[in-house]
């Protein structure tokens, strides 16, 4: 069946994990357990821009460096906590944290890792951010060179199609 599953989840934007990320995680774990596949868990994030005209170039550079270190540390903590929810399943799991634009980085990681399945969560269209991320999910469904499963949390209705 499947040998390598890539689970892509947006951990940066949530204090607590979204129902979409948790549903995708549960589905990826179930499929990996059923097929004996390796599971890679990818979260792509970015750094907030520093754009304060009152800061000197040196201060802005120091602030940005500090922001990057804090963001990296925060993302490592979020990934560990997210993976703690699947400990004890006796699965080979590889956590991956990358910076960049999600759709591009996910496709890059697919090219590097060669998974035979990508698992992503669907996103409801409640905010501009959800529309953007929903666009990422739709893009991956069209462009990923492997099978893709898009998972919705239980009880959530499918959003209207945006590709018609």
Across the structure, where does each feature detected by a protein language model lie?
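Structural beta-alpha unit
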Residues: 1, 84-118, 155-164
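Short secondary-structure boundary segments
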Residues: 9, 43, 121-123, 152-153
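General small-molecule cofactor/ligand-binding pocket signal
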Residues: 40-42, 94-98, 149
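Glycine-rich, Arg-bearing micro-motifs that act as flexible, cationic patches
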Residues: 117-139, 157-158
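Acidic, proline/glycine-rich short linear motifs
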Residues: 42-74, 157-164
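Short, flexible loop segments at boundaries between secondary-structure elements
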Residues: 146-158
């Amino acid at each position: 069946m499947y040998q390598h599953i890539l689970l892509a989840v947006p951990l940066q934007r949530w204090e607590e994990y979204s129902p979409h990320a948790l549903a995708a995680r549960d589905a990826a774990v179930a499929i990996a357990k059923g097929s004996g596949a390796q599971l890679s868990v990818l979260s792509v994030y970015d750094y907030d821009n520093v754009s304060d005209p009152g800061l000197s170039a040196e201060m802005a550079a120091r602030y940005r460096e500090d922001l990057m270190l804090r963001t990296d540390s925060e993302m490592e903590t979020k990934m560990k906590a997210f993976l703690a929810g699947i400990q004890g399943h006796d699965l080979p799991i590889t956590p991956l944290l990358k910076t960049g634009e999600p759709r591009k980085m996910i496709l890059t990681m697919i090219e590097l890792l060669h998974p035979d399945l990508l698992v992503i969560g669907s996103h409801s269209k409640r905010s501009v951010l959800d529309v953007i991320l929903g666009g990422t999910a739709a893009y991956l469904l069209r462009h990923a060179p492997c099978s893709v499963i898009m998972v919705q949390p239980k009880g959530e209705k499918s959003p209207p199609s945006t590709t018609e």
